[in-house]
Amino acid sequence: MTMITPSFPGNSLAVVLQRRDWENPGVTQLNRLAAHPPFASWRNSEEARTDRPSQQLRSLNGEWRFAWFPAPEAVPESWLECDLPEADTVVVPSNWQMHGYDAPIYTNVTYPITVNPPFVPTENPTGCYSLTFNVDESWLQEGQTRIIFDGVNSAFHLWCNGRWVGYGQDSRLPSEFDLSAFLRAGENRLAVMVLRWSDGSYLEDQDMWRMSGIFRDVSLLHKPTTQISDFHVATRFNDDFSRAVLEAEVQMCGELRDYLRVTVSLWQGETQVASGTAPFGGEIIDERGGYADRVTLRLNVENPKLWSAEIPNLYRAVVELHTADGTLIEAEACDVGFREVRIENGLLLLNGKPLLIRGVNRHEHHPLHGQVMDEQTMVQDILLMKQNNFNAVRCSHYPNHPLWYTLCDRYGLYVVDEANIETHGMVPMNRLTDDPRWLPAMSERVTRMVQRDRNHPSVIIWSLGNESGHGANHDALYRWIKSVDPSRPVQYEGGGADTTATDIICPMYARVDEDQPFPAVPKWSIKKWLSLPGETRPLILCEYAHAMGNSLGGFAKYWQAFRQYPRLQGGFVWDWVDQSLIKYDENGNPWSAYGGDFGDTPNDRQFCMNGLVFADRTPHPALTEAKHQQQFFQFRLSGQTIEVTSEYLFRHSDNELLHWMVALDGKPLASGEVPLDVAPQGKQLIELPELPQPESAGQLWLTVRVVQPNATAWSEAGHISAWQQWRLAENLSVTLPAASHAIPHLTTSEMDFCIELGNKRWQFNRQSGFLSQMWIGDKKQLLTPLRDQFTRAPLDNDIGVSEATRIDPNAWVERWKAAGHYQAEAALLQCTADTLADAVLITTAHAWQHQGKTLFISRKTYRIDGSGQMAITVDVEVASDTPHPARIGLNCQLAQVAERVNWLGLGPQENYPDRLTAACFDRWDLPLSDMYTPYVFPSENGLRCGTRELNYGPHQWRGDFQFNISRYSQQQLMETSHRHLLHAEEGTWLNIDGFHMGIGGDDSWSPSVSAEFQLSAGRYHYQLVWCQK
């Protein structure tokens, strides 16, 4: 194969502007080099083997000159020769919007430009970058010097020393050009004109911030004239994986000589495992022969150490191009993982064993840097994923930074590599995939991804893109991948998740048991999908459990199904990280922004924040629920025997201790530690000693935790990987409390009932029927009366797609508003006081009404005895024709602000009725500030369920209830758009709920709280005791 001579359609800016390559779907590149795996062109095989920095690879990251223009036509021709006076300095890589030029736009489905493909607006923001640099003189004398742009959004033209070099688009894959003919001795100048919009933008309608610029690395690479132009490695096995073959196909370009040889050596650390040498000349392909510029070498490997996410064993393959006498011309290298992926009998298998995908979707996002990814952030993401029992990641919805795949190889994550194709805003969605004019553009996005990433063992599945419908173009691309790389399955959700263009049924947001009959592309329940006639493929949800704000309710139902049905092989949670961006107020204080905060239109508000972690990678409480449901050890208690089952496919437990503890109301009574010795997919029985039988009252709980005593590549020593709790018994008190000789005194006035006992007083307003005040000594305890509460500050899942300009009457919040739940007022039906032998009894009844209609009837009794305890009993009736309420509880504003909150119940993290399997029953003690979850969009938060006792300041509440406590009222949470605008109110707001509706999370745009977690009973009863410590 001979070197390609660049073509030059014209140097001038005027010629480029006239051609308008960015509005021609048939032009995806001009003079761009062919795709290949990342190169380093080592000139020393030892450096290639140890992956040392190559002297032939030079980074151009750093400060570049930059000028912004509203359209490419506004760029002066003189810019090609010299920097403009108005030019500033920006760092490359970066998004120019993060430097104050132009505005980022957040939109989900709607295109940010008028839909008229392939044309884009004449107002097309344009960034003009320039850089002066010198190159090593030896690079000019021989060989080829390339420039590599790893990511530019969305299209760009490149000049070097005033001469036009080429054009590229597809913002998420490299564009590489040969600069050899343009470089000169001394100083050289690059000029890069980046356009915000191009015809490629119609293929990049992903749910994300729309940003621009050179946002990935830029580098120079010097290769010899005769060079390795591509290499591909694959692993083959015998039936029991005891023998393997490393198959390496190497391609060269330049002057083909008989004396050229290729050596491929395989290394494990310092040990060479296998090696082979061959001249060029491929195997016979057809009657015309084979490829003269290619060679395939096959290296036999006995007892290979297999790669998996559990045990990411890696070898190193070094590919050397040399002469017959051994003189090295150049070397390339890559990590190799011996593993096999195939689908057999309806199951996705890795190394012969069925995978259970514990996956998450991940956008490349940084709150300060936009879409620029650095190694530290990538490693942080991987460590958090591994620590929280994720084993897979979907690159949603584009090929990621090249380093991401290397890190996934080394730390161990399964990767779905996804083409940069999404046309969600098209009507119909498949408009472009059924148009042959768009096949070249779509084809390059798929073929180049495969050619770049196919050497990575972590990549186990190719994806043809996201939400682009299904058409002839996708069918063609599916066939191309299956021809070129039959070693991996292909998945594609578009067109219904089960078309002919996918090997895996990969729906998004299909529910466990409920069908969703959408037009043309129904979403069956995942259980039903498996049983459809003729369907034999595995099902892996490409997106599920929409983690927007306070969400992930019902997550456990999915995992029950995954473990029950073998062909339900898991899924990818949507998604990993909140896509909020940092802005600064007038005082320089940072705050988290979402759609619309930059004046961007159109925008989809806070829909960009669906993460299991905040933008700064602080975990959401829901992450703990995901960790628990996905844990690799499962437990069953039978008598005094704990059965531990390992869901690891390849790992024998060699770094795990099982800690067990029996506690009564959080007080440890007995504990122990047992080393785990469990084979992959095996079991271990652990016999506990005779457990204590306490005589005192309380709940007896057995807790087991799996602890890793030693640090690993992804966790510190002491990491807890799995846990489970069982309630063994509940002993009731058999001793009567000591009789009090004091008797509370009741005073009745026209306005109030007042009860006094020592230094304590309780006041009930006879006009409202509420407990209006309490005193301890002369200190008031309440800032607002104790009232019924049936509402919550709406969650994202409660709001759904409803907004001011588009009301969705089916959304929970709109149903509550329409019924008057938020506007309901109490009509007093009864308020009486009685003096008993040793107590005072207050009896009240209220009808909560809106526009004359009764929504709730609440009947309460307050029994204040001689010990100062107030026992509250509540009975609530819900009108049959009103929507199920969000909660049934009590609310008040306490006068105190205490530093800490202590409770006996489920914790320590926020938990809700349909998201509490990860919470543990114990006695917890946290700062008041930790009881609030700082969701960027304020909403109901901080609930703790299963509470038996709550202590705050001088007060104690006992019973069986749920509570949240913070400095923010429900009203403020409802009226505030961003968390930084919240202000701490006087005192502390307390909600005590007898019952609370689930939060849902199957998706965030339709009501998704399962029926068993809705408050549909009609009648409710709860009680609690309020006293002072």
From Swiss-Prot:
Coiled coil: none annotated. It catalyses: Hydrolysis of terminal non-reducing beta-D-galactose residues in beta-D-galactosides. Pfam families: Bgal_small_N, Glyco_hydro_2, Glyco_hydro_2_C, Glyco_hydro_2_N, LacZ_4. The keyword Metal-binding applies. Keywords: Glycosidase, Hydrolase, Magnesium, Metal-binding, Plasmid, Sodium. One of its GO terms (molecular function) is carbohydrate binding. InterPro entries: B-gal_small/dom_5 (IPR004199), Bact_Beta-galactosidase (IPR050347), Beta-gal/glucu_dom_sf (IPR036156), Gal_mutarotase_sf_dom (IPR011013), Galactose-bd-like_sf (IPR008979), GH-type_carb-bd (IPR014718), Glyco_hydro_2 (IPR006101), Glyco_hydro_2_AS (IPR023232). Homotetramer. HAMAP family: Beta_gal. This is Beta-galactosidase. The gene is lacZ.
